[in-house]
Amino acid sequence: MNNYKKPFLIAEIGCNHMGQLEIAKDLINLAKMSGASVAKFQKRDNIKLLSKEQYNSPHPNPNNSYGKTYGEHREFLEFSIDIHKDLKLYCEELGIDYATSVWDIISAREVISLDPKFIKVPSACNNNEELLKVLRDEYQGEVHISVGMTNKLEEEKIISLFENNKSAKERLVIYSCTSGYPVPFKDICLMEISRLQEEYGNRVKNIGFSGHHLGIAVDMAAFTLGANIIERHFTKDRTWKGTDHAASLEPNGLLKLSRDLNAVYESLSYKEEEILEIEKEQRLKLKFKSN
């Protein structure tokens, strides 16, 4: 019997659409064809998020910038809520779920109006208590939260905040994550999945894994450790301009990840009988027979 939950694969498109709606829709289509369950984006209010100094400063990596300043760069990559509504409708037409990470309260309330199945909070914002309260109190769907660059006291505050209205067990999903782009294998720390399962598994709905690493081998191990929700950044071309493309999977990589996760899921079981049906004929032909 297989007690593992079925793999749930999230294609994190994020800002890899490069500010172009047609590329975003193309990536949704490719994510669906590659076996993803969700096409996920991001929503930010850059004026609220960035200080005036940050907004007007140059991008730290000018080769990846889409504007003269970091603020202009972020605005270029930002979709309006009307475009997000269009993307959600397109996802529904294709039969793939739409989801979005939100970075601030304004964005959270805008995305809540679209009523997606879940809304995600990135590691950078998981200590924004007011943001978490808005998602807890004004939204009925699942709230997914990454805990990269987060200490145990901060983790406990997140769980407790949702337990305060008894919604953690029904609605809260916590993701093991290391915040880096890309993350070297030694810093992925997969055993954190086991720790999160042991400490919070009976207090939250589920434990996931958000990976910023290269390749797909690590994701197989993450799944076997109990993280059936796997999130990976997704792009059409890893050489495209932007900071996230290099740590993303291309369609062929996502397709292989989906294939391999499902293969591992199907194989994780005990034998239902001592000699399986597939073995019986081989046993008759090959098993040593004593005189």
Predicted regions and their residues:
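Catalytic cores and adjacent flexible loops of soluble metabolic enzymes
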Residues: 1-291
